[in-house]
Curated annotation (Swiss-Prot):
Paired cysteines (S-S): C5-C20, C7-C15, C14-C37, C28-C34, C33-C58, C46-C65
Protein name per its UniProtKB record: Disintegrin crotatroxin
Tissue: Expressed by the venom gland.
The species this protein was found in: Crotalus atrox
UniProt similarity note: Belongs to the venom metalloproteinase (M12B) family. P-II subfamily. P-IIa sub-subfamily.
Primary location recorded for the protein, binned into one broad class: secreted
The keyword Disulfide bond belongs to this UniProt entry's keyword annotation: yes
Gene3D superfamilies: Disintegrin domain
Subcellular location(s) per record: Secreted
SMART domains with a match to the protein in the record: DISIN
Any GO molecular function: toxin activity
Motif (Cell attachment site): 50-52
Keyword Lipid biosynthesis (UniProt): no
Note: The disintegrin belongs to the medium disintegrin subfamily.
């Protein structure tokens, strides 16, 4: 509990491996919507459409790539 990021790799520039907390100024450490310790801007495709699924896009508020669901 209390971990903000995966402290498995001391090489991660976004995460302090000793404390498992994000480094100062970092918004995220990993994830499809995280780039260079920052959230990727809203609307950026993080998982392209496949079959009956829409493109999944970043929210701008999270490092996760949410499932946007089936075509309407």
């Amino acid at each position: 509990a209390g971990e903000e990021c995966d402290c498995g790799s001391p090489a991660n520039p976004c995460c302090d491996a000793a404390t498992c907390k994000l480094r100062p100024g970092a918004q995220c450490a990993d994830g499809l919507c995280c780039d260079q310790c920052r959230f990727i801007k809203k609307g950026t495709v993080c998982r392209p459409a496949r079959g009956d699924w829409n493109d999944d896009t970043c929210t701008g508020q999270s490092a996760d790539c949410p499932r946007n669901g089936l075509y309407g």
